[in-house]
Amino acid sequence: MSFIDEVKINVKSGDGGAGCVSFRREKFIPLGGPDGGDGGKGGDVIVKVSSHLSTLLDLRQHPHQKAGRGKNGMGSDRHGANGHTLEILVPQGTVIKDAETGEILADLAEPDSSMVLLKGGRGGQGNARFKTATHKAPKFAQPGEPGEERWIRMELKLMADVGLLGMPSVGKSSLIAKISAARPKIAEYHFTTLKPSLGVVQYKNYRSFVMADIPGLIEGASEGAGLGHRFLKHLERTGQLLHLLDLSWMPDRDPIAEYEAINRELALFNPELADKRQTVVVNKIDLPHVRENLKEILPYFEERGIKVFPISAATGEGIPELLDDIAFNLWGEPEETW
């Protein structure tokens, strides 16, 4: 499956313009000296963060990007114009890697950050530059330097304060739709969410935070199983994680075993992920048998000092308390002091 969070493109900076071989041609000056101008510099390739972008879709549609070539030098000591600079706009959070080696070239995590990815070639010198006392009429000039070219891979890591994770179909999309403006596709089958989506949650006193609905994970995700490690990377920059459990399938499915399986995948992919703050959220608490099943799993989490919030994405039960806890973890102060 394909997601607009990763793209491979070819980028090339501009070639430098050639220097000119020219001699003065003026009336009454039969032996005019060299007057060939220099070639223009090739255009650089610059990558810059734009606050107006949220995907890499445009680059996927235009995989070949090229800066302008420098113009050739001209007679009468006229220099060629520099090639136009190519400015590639990307969303905040884009990581740029060499497509062949995997080397990280840039991590554009800050707003308005930018970098020169490739330098344009220098323009060649015209023959006027090579005139000496012993060589007054040079009939040669320098060619322009070629620009640089490389294949790069861009990866967009979602910038979110809170990440939702859990097995497929535990209710992550329903929760984010309930508490934010996001409207992810929702249905009763696995892997409904085929790409990560962001929702802005408006909290009290005009405060807000961003929540990422990460598609359902399964065992083996760290090795690419299911929708694979392409989703795990989106959790790396979230400040905290909400781990959703669905108790409605007990005893056919073991929610504690699923919880442990996902945490193993987090640790295998990146040990720091397993250390992130996690809050366990039990969805569908409006169903009577889920309330009964909650009593069975609570001791496991209480022994480990892990908070459990029973909520219902359908009715809204428990959601205000959950949002208060998220806000406290994000901003570290009680709501009354804001």
From Swiss-Prot:
GO biological process: ribosome biogenesis
Keyword Hydrolase: yes
CDD domains the UniProt entry points to: Obg (cd01898)
Cellular component, GO, one term: cytoplasm
Disulfide bonds: none
EC number(s) stated in the UniProt entry for this protein: 3.6.5.-
Cofactor: Mg(2+)
Entry keywords, A to Z: Cytoplasm, GTP-binding, Hydrolase, Magnesium, Metal-binding, Nucleotide-binding
Domain of life according to the entry: Bacteria
Location within or outside the cell: Cytoplasm
Predominant subcellular localization, coarse grouping: cytoplasm
A GO MF label: magnesium ion binding
Record bears the keyword Hydrolase: yes
Quaternary structure (record): Monomer.
Function, as annotated: An essential GTPase which binds GTP, GDP and possibly (p)ppGpp with moderate affinity, with high nucleotide exchange rates and a fairly low GTP hydrolysis rate. Plays a role in control of the cell cycle, stress response, ribosome biogenesis and in those bacteria that undergo differentiation, in morphogenesis control.
The protein, known as: GTPase Obg
Organism: Citrifermentans bemidjiense (strain ATCC BAA-1014 / DSM 16622 / JCM 12645 / Bem)
